[in-house]
């Protein structure tokens, strides 16, 4: 049987303030805004913004009442980087606080090991920068 060969299209994140979140993802994480849309509903407008960086795409969703949806949790969004030390330094220079002081390292995670560290976005979403070794 032929495999479906699925890839990740995007990750949707519920946000309280679309403008604050767009600025964070564009200015701090250097995502490009690729598309915006307002979904008209009887209960109020839902604001959507799609942003991308390399082959990573996210969808920011602001519900009409700016409250988190009941659609279930997303634990974190991991962003792939080639030089975690450099990216971390850039993010720190932009005021991003990290959850831990040290970059985590596991030599047995993935074929050649992995390094990662977590931080939070403007709506408390947990973000990770991750370098596969």
Task: Give short role names for the model-derived ranges.
Residues 37-41, 64-65, 103-109:
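Short, solvent-exposed loop/turn elements at beta->coil junctions and helix N-caps
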Residues 27-28, 90-94:
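Short amphipathic alpha-helices in soluble, non-transmembrane regions
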Residues 14-56:
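Core segments of cupin and vicinal oxygen chelate
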Residues 45-47, 73, 113:
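Exposed loop/turn and edge beta-strand positions of beta-sandwich/beta-sheet ligand-binding modules
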Residues 1-20, 74-79, 133:
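N-terminal beta-strand motif that seeds the catalytic metal site of vicinal oxygen chelate
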